[in-house]
């Protein structure tokens, strides 16, 4: 089987490459499609093709004679100044990848969406389901989720040309070892470094990168087109999460938990002052606002059709902490 991966140099992409290699696929049959080569890909021995998801012709060439495409490319940013780049990568890039795969005769595309497209609520007692409505009313104010939601709609829709099947997987917050770039585990790192001054009032769902990667491998031959597949382990409040991290690490838990609105207002006021002083704000306004919401989700499809059974949350947190402490 010949496999191409956009965004294959990222945290999830490298884990998917490793999972395929562990299953016996030759690294030479794995081609990472990206604008630049991540140094860790050299250790895996996978092939590399220079191409951007914003270049349709380059993608068509990259997908020629490929059986399976993983579309994992994305830009994780809470900075509103990155809105244009996120639209180009998420929306235009997904459209380009789907069209290129169809034109190349690729049999299947597995697309990495997010639980944030549907799994977000102000009410912690209401846990959104993968078959429920999207969360546009809440999350569209942030460019990352707005563009991921638009991209997901493209992937869920019937493909207008060709026989390419598209499977949409929705991983929650991805934790675990190996996030050398800090793209997904920064909040845990901030806790370890004492950069979490208050406890937010929201909640999260998270999943181990190794479990998510295994599900992406299984999705090469399983999954339901036109439907979301939640990859999540557990819904926890931020308070519960930091309590677990404190027990694992000995790092003291912040005791101050002001009302959600006050946290958001304070971050909005303090962030410009920090930047004027040439410093990064401890908590930027977008992060503060997101942290007051409950990014909870539920669903059984991945368990039923992909055999997805995540490891315990404590194991994931312990391995995340162990990795981050080893590279600090």
Model region roles, listed by residue range:
Residues 3-25:
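N-terminal Rossmann NAD(P)H-binding glycine-rich loop of SDR-like oxidoreductase domains
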Residues 89-143:
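Conserved Rossmann-fold NAD(P)-dependent oxidoreductase catalytic core, especially the SDR/UDP-sugar
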Residues 135-140, 189-207, 211:
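A conserved pocket-lining segment of Rossmann-fold NAD(P)-dependent short-chain dehydrogenase/reductase
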Residues 139-167:
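Active-site Tyr-X1-5-Lys
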Residues 215-282, 299, 304, 313-328:
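Mid/C-terminal beta-alpha module of Rossmann-like enzyme folds, strongest
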């Amino acid at each position: 089987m010949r496999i191409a991966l956009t965004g294959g140099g990222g945290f999830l992409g490298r884990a998917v490459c490793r999972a395929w290699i562990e299953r016996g696929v030759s690294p030479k049959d794995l081609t990472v499609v990206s604008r630049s080569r991540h140094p860790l890909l050299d250790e895996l021995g996978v092939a590399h093709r220079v191409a951007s998801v914003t270049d349709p012709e380059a993608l068509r060439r990259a997908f020629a004679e490929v059986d399976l495409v993983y579309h994992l490319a994305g830009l994780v940013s809470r900075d509103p100044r990155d809105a244009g780049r996120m639209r180009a990568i998420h929306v235009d890039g997904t459209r380009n990848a789907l069209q290129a795969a169809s034109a190349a005769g690729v049999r299947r595309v597995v697309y990495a969406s997010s639980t944030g497209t549907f799994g977000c609520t102000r009410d912690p007692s209401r846990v959104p389901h993968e078959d429920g409505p999207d969360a546009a009313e809440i999350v569209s104010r942030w460019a990352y989720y707005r563009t991921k939601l638009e991209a997901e709609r493209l992937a869920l829709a019937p493909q207008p040309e060709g026989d390419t099947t598209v499977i949409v997987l929705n991983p929650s917050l991805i934790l675990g070892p190996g996030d050398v770039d800090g793209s997904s585990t920064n909040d845990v790192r901030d806790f370890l470094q004492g950069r979490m001054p208050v406890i937010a009032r929201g909640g999260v769902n998270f999943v181990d990168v190794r479990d998510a990667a295994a599900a992406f491998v299984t999705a090469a031959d399983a999954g339901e087109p036109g439907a979301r597949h939640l990859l999540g382990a557990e819904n926890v409040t931020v308070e519960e999460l930091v309590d677990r991290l404190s027990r694992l690490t000995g790092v003291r838990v912040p005791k101050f938990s002001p009302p959600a609105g006050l946290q958001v207002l304070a971050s909005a006021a303090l962030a410009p002052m920090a930047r004027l002083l040439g410093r990064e704000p401890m908590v930027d306004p977008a992060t503060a606002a997101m942290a007051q919401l409950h990014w909870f989700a539920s669903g059984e499809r991945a368990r039923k059709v992909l055999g997805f059974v995540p490891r315990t949350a404590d194991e994931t947190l312990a391995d995340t902490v162990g990795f981050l402490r080893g590279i600090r």
